[in-house]
Amino acid sequence: MSAQKPGLHPRNRHHSRYDLATLCQVNPELRQFLTLTPAGEQSVDFANPLAVKALNKALLAHFYAVANWDIPDGFLCPPVPGRADYIHHLADLLAEASGTIQANASILDIGVGANCIYPLIGVHEYGWRFTGSETSSQALSSAQAIISANPGLNRAIRLRRQKESGAIFNGIIHKNEQYDATLCNPPFHDSATAARAGSERKRRNLGLNKDDALNFGGQQQELWCEGGEVAFIKKMIEESKGFAKQVMWFTSLVSRGENLPPLYRALTDVGAVKVVKKEMAQGQKQSRFIAWTFMNDEQRRRFVNRQR
């Protein structure tokens, strides 16, 4: 009997331990990265970025029908189960307006990344349509390559370059566009030094030395920004007021619980009508996202009906 991972959303496909035999059939290159734990169980060498990339390729192909997926060296290689959890909890949030999970919901992914992970999962699981924004032209090229390499995704996912320095929604949400929700995995460090320190902590936790290969990649825009996560989300909150009638729910991951109080104050300042916190857990890792709206219950119901 496979042990369940505590805390994952009930609809998450990754409750059981990875079936490595099946995943190696899906992506044979994964086999070379298998290791044995001290307990004699087969596992993946998570300290090796090539191993994590091979695992992601297998997971996305097996569970989400993404046959062709790759990212350039140096970009974040996201853990698929945790990313899927955000999508499933977001689906529950959207269902509150109509009583059913929305098909064909329109979602804006702020910082879609080279990996395009949230749109890939959301399209397969719920048939949603995505717009992905990104500041990095290299990340956009990578995401577009994934979309173009997998039949059907071009109709479901479109990408936009954020050309305005420091802007989040401005320049991305066009006049008369409407979105059921936005999502975001914001940069969490406030400097390159802090980002390096975070990588060092992960390195030590895995018992690695400085010369060991790392699964802690990430470009500057993925890992840090001035003021860190709180400043980034506060900017998002500030801009969201200008799109109060075009977006039903604004959401963002928040990496640390202690970052919530200043965000709640910012949401009060802009007049958010409702604020929700969704707690998530993947194994030992605790995470959460906050969601806010400028629409009351009746306005959200009308918004959903108008979108269909």
Swiss-Prot record:
It catalyses: adenosine(1618) in 23S rRNA + S-adenosyl-L-methionine = N(6)-methyladenosine(1618) in 23S rRNA + S-adenosyl-L-homocysteine + H(+). Keywords: Cytoplasm, Methyltransferase, rRNA processing, S-adenosyl-L-methionine, Transferase. It holds the Pfam family Methyltransf_10. GO terms for biological process: rRNA base methylation. GO terms for molecular function: 23S rRNA (adenine(1618)-N(6))-methyltransferase activity. InterPro entries: METTL16/RlmF, rRNA_lsu_MeTfrase_F, SAM-dependent_MTases_sf. It comes from the Bacteria. Its main location: cytoplasm. It is found in: Cytoplasm. Its EC number is 2.1.1.181. NCBIfam families: PRK11727.1. This is Ribosomal RNA large subunit methyltransferase F. The lineage of its organism: Bacteria, Pseudomonadati, Pseudomonadota, Gammaproteobacteria, Enterobacterales.
